[in-house]
Amino acid sequence: MMKSIKCLYAASLLAIGSTAAMAQASYTDKDGNEYQFKRHWFLDIQAGGQYTVGEASFSDLLSPNFQGAIGYQFSPVFGLRGQINGIWSKGGWNGYKATKDGTPYTASYKWKYVAPGVDFMFNLSNLFCGWNPNRVFNATAFVGGGINWAGANQEVNDLAANIKNQSNYLLEYLWQGKKVRPYGRAGIDLEFRVSKAVSIMLEGNANMISDKYNSKKADNPDWYFNALAGV
């Protein structure tokens, strides 16, 4: 996991050099008005929902999600933002049988998390169509990572207390207290310009984290997906 995140950061840092030449981009509209790109700060505030991949029904794995970010646009193509995302993830079972003839077991649980991180952002509209400050729609792809701080995992521990053989229910990574784990993520932002300073944003991101995140052993990383809207 850490190796993948380091490689991701290294590749993104190389991209800074390739986009730096575009930092002084200019644009002239049909009326002859000339615009010069200026480096600038930006702020994102978003809310939406999360789907945590698991064995429960789809609806039982949905939870509210919130994200805030502050970033800097270095060039028409490249930007960097620090973001923080949370606040719940979910897990569970839907008609799960520990043995072939066992009784179907259905339950769900949630826990809290806060995940600060850094995203390397690439404006695809400016990359392929050139910089245009009056463009109504922009698509931006991003990759990044950070630290996931998780806690309040009592619900699954309460369920486990009534399960005789926890390993049969995949609960080999049951945890309590607070856990800090690295994560990597990628996603896309779709921005609709409302004014010179404000855009409506739709975002989707996929997050990869340790297999231990949802307390279950699956021999592969855990995933959660966020769908967000904001400004």
Task: Specify the residue positions occupied by each region the protein language model found.
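Transmembrane beta-strands of outer-membrane beta-barrel proteins
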Residues: W41-I45, L80-G82, P116-V118, F137-G145, ...
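Extracellular loop and loop/strand-boundary signature of outer-membrane beta-barrel proteins
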Residues: K30-D31, V53-A56, Y96-Y109, S167-Q176, ...
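Short loop/turn motifs that connect adjacent beta-strands in outer-membrane beta-barrel proteins
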Residues: Q24-H40, V77, N126-A139, V194-A197
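Short glycine/proline- and aromatic-enriched beta-strand/turn motifs that initiate or cap beta-hairpins
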Residues: A23-G71, A152
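Predominantly the C-terminal beta-signal and adjacent terminal strand-loop region
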Residues: W93-G95, W111-Y113, S195-V231
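Gram-negative (and chloroplast) outer-membrane scaffold detector with strong preference
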Residues: F78-K164
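Residues that define the transmembrane beta-barrel architecture of outer-membrane proteins
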Residues: R39, D60-F66, K110-P116, F137, ...
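Residues on the lipid-exposed face of transmembrane beta-strands in outer-membrane beta-barrel proteins
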Residues: I45-G49, G68-Y72, V118-L124, V143-I147, ...
